[in-house]
C-alpha cells in the first residue's frame, strides 16, 4: 500500500479526511434512498472502474473474489496486508465511495479491531462488511457480547478519525446454516438487532432468499437490510418493493467473469475457435481509456 494513505497514523502528512468523510456520508445516504442500492462486487482496480463507468454510485468489494484473484481460497486465508493492499488499489482507482468486505476484521479483540479500523480507513475505504463467524467448527459464532463490542470499536474508532464508516454487520445464521431451522429467524433478529444498537448502519443476512422471511426480517430489524443475491432470490425490483435497502452479489460477478474465461479456454482447446472470445471482449481502446485516468 502506498504510504501517504497511512501517514496520518504515523505522524506525518495528513490525508484528506474531509473528502473521505463526505464519501462515507454519501454511502450512508444511499442506504436510505428511494431505490435499492445494487452492488455487483468488485475484486480489483479494473472491475471497480468498470462498475463506476457504467454508473454505479458506490463500489463494494468481495473478500472471496479478492482472495481468488490473488491465489487464495475464501475464509480470511489472504493476509491482512494483502487484503488492505487490494482495497487501497481499488479506492485509488475510483472516485465513488468504496465499502470493503473485510470478513471478521483480522482481529479477535475489540482493541485489535480498532487498530484494523485505522488501517482500513488509511486504505481509503469508507464502509465495511463485518461478519460474526469464527471459522471454528465447535464454536461457529463469535459470542454476541464480544461481537457487539467489536462493532462499537469500529464505530468509535472511525468517528474519532473523522471518517464515520458505514458498518454493514453480517450474521451467517442462514448461510452456514447455524442451529435448527425453526430457530434461525429468531437468532438472526437477535444478532442483527444487537448489531444495529451497537452502531451498525446496515444489517446483512446472506443465505436468505425466501420472500416471506425477507419481508419479515425487514420489519423486525428496523434498519437497512442487505441481501446477497443468488439463484432463486427475488429480483432487485421485488427486493426493493419488499423494503430491502441493499443487494450485493458477493463473488458472483467475479465467478461469472471466470466462467466466461473458462469457456473461452475450453473453446480454444476443443474447437480451435476464438468466436466466444470476440463476442465478449471489451474493446482495447475503451479499456485503455478507462484505465488511463489518473489515480487518486
Where are these regions (language model features)?
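Classical N-terminal secretory signal peptides
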Residues: 1-4, 40
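Alpha/beta enzyme core
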Residues: 18-30, 37-97, 104-227, 233-242, ...
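Short, Lys/Arg-enriched N-terminal segments with co-localized hydrophobic residues
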Residues: 3-14
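Short, surface-exposed amphipathic charged segments that create phosphate/polyanion-binding patches used
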Residues: 241-243, 263-264
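Extended, intrinsically disordered, low-complexity segments
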Residues: 16-20, 27, 252-296
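A general structural signal for well-ordered secondary-structure junctions
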Residues: 36-37, 274
Amino acid at each position: 500500500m502506498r504510504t501517504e494513505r497511512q501517514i496520518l497514523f504515523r505522524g506525518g502528512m495528513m490525508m484528506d479526511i474531509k473528502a473521505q468523510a463526505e464519501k462515507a456520508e454519501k454511502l450512508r445516504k444511499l442506504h436510505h434512498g428511494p431505490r435499492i442500492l445494487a452492488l455487483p462486487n468488485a475484486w480489483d482496480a479494473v472491475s471497480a472502474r468498470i462498475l463506476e463507468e457504467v454508473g454505479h454510485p458506490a463500489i463494494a468489494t468481495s473478500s472471496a473474489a479478492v482472495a481468488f484473484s490473488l491465489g487464495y481460497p475464501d475464509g480470511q486465508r489472504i493476509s491482512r496486508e494483502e487484503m488492505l493492499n487490494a482495497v487501497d488499489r481499488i479506492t485509488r482507482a475510483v472516485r465513488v465511495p468504496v465499502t470493503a468486505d473485510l470478513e471478521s476484521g483480522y482481529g479477535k479483540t475489540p482493541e485489535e479491531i480498532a487498530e484494523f479500523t485505522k488501517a482500513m480507513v488509511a486504505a481509503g475505504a469508507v464502509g465495511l462488511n463485518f461478519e460474526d463467524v469464527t471459522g471454528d467448527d465447535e464454536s461457529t459464532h463469535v459470542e454476541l457480547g464480544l461481537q457487539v463490542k467489536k462493532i462499537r470499536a469500529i464505530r468509535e474508532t472511525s468517528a474519532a478519525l473523522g471518517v464515520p464508516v458505514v458498518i454493514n454487520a453480517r450474521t451467517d445464521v442462514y448461510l452456514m446454516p447455524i442451529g435448527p431451522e425453526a430457530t434461525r429467524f429468531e437468532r438472526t433478529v437477535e444478532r442483527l438487532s444487537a448489531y444495529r444498537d451497537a452502531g451498525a448502519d446496515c444489517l446483512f443476512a446472506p443465505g436468505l432468499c425466501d420472500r416471506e422471511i425477507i419481508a419479515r426480517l425487514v420489519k423486525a430489524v428496523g434498519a437497512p437490510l442487505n441481501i446477497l443475491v443468488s439463484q432463486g432470490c427475488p429480483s432487485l425490483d421485488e427486493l426493493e418493493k419488499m423494503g430491502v435497502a441493499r443487494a450485493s452479489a458477493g463473488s458472483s460477478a467475479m465467478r461469472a467473469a471466470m466462467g466466461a474465461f473458462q469457456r473461452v479456454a475450453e473453446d480454444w482447446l476443443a474447437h480451435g475457435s476464438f468466436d466466444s472470445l470476440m463476442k465478449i471482449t471489451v474493446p482495447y481502446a475503451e479499456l485503455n481509456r478507462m484505465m488511463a485516468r489518473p489515480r487518486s
